[in-house]
Amino acid sequence: MSRVAKKPVSLPKGVELNVQSELVSVKGPKGTLTLPKPTGVEIAIDGDVATLSANDPSQIAITGTVRAILANMVKGVSEGFERKLELVGVGYRAAMQGKDLSLALGFSHPLVFVAPEGITLSTPTQTEILVQGADKQRVGEVAAKIRGFRPPEPYKGKGVKYAGEVIIRKEAKKA
């Protein structure tokens, strides 16, 4: 079995793991997440610890993946995930209009982004966007979609970038 799959998933207080024949659901203070249960992977719950095992040798590889996804689901419903974006550039601004995000990114019109269900958007400052949610994959997808509106360009670094992202700069053309 893979090294990742051998490691048990600990369930913090307030998190409930429910395994059915076709579905695995994790319920916690931040919401409920579900995962279709792959065939050949067994999930055993012993108190506040869940362990995974493969029934079939061909399913050993997927067991580690399922364990990692399950651990992310447990962390998501207990603590949640967040991704911070920064707007770099003159006149680049973000503001909330109700639950929608309005972005001024140098286009002739403001972009309005509607947050999908389960994702919370906020703007601590005019040049910062905070994407929060219980599902790690959806938080990353939404952050990537917002970043895709105006990815950072390599000459001046203007655009929407992840917090802490290093933009490799190019030198301007010499005359």
Swiss-Prot record:
What InterPro entries would the database entry show?
Answer: Ribosomal_uL6-like (IPR000702), Ribosomal_uL6-like_a/b-dom_sf (IPR036789), Ribosomal_uL6_a/b-dom (IPR020040), Ribosomal_uL6_bac-type (IPR019906), Ribosomal_uL6_CS (IPR002358)
Q: Which UniProt keywords apply?
A: Ribonucleoprotein, Ribosomal protein, RNA-binding, rRNA-binding
Biological processes annotated in GO = cytoplasmic translation
Tell me the superkingdom of the source: Bacteria
**Pfam families noted in UniProt:** Ribosomal_L6
Q: Which GO terms describe its cellular component?
A: cytosolic large ribosomal subunit
Q: Which GO terms describe its molecular function?
A: rRNA binding; structural constituent of ribosome
Query: Does the keyword Ribonucleoprotein belong to this entry?
Result: yes
The protein's assembly and partners: Part of the 50S ribosomal subunit.
What this chain does, per the entry, is described as: This protein binds to the 23S rRNA, and is important in its secondary structure. It is located near the subunit interface in the base of the L7/L12 stalk, and near the tRNA binding site of the peptidyltransferase center.
Report the family membership. Belongs to the universal ribosomal protein uL6 family.
NCBIfam families assigned: L6_bact (TIGR03654)
- Which HAMAP family does this chain map to? Ribosomal_uL6_B
Which named protein is this? Answer: Large ribosomal subunit protein uL6
Protein source organism? Xanthomonas oryzae pv. oryzae (strain KACC10331 / KXO85)
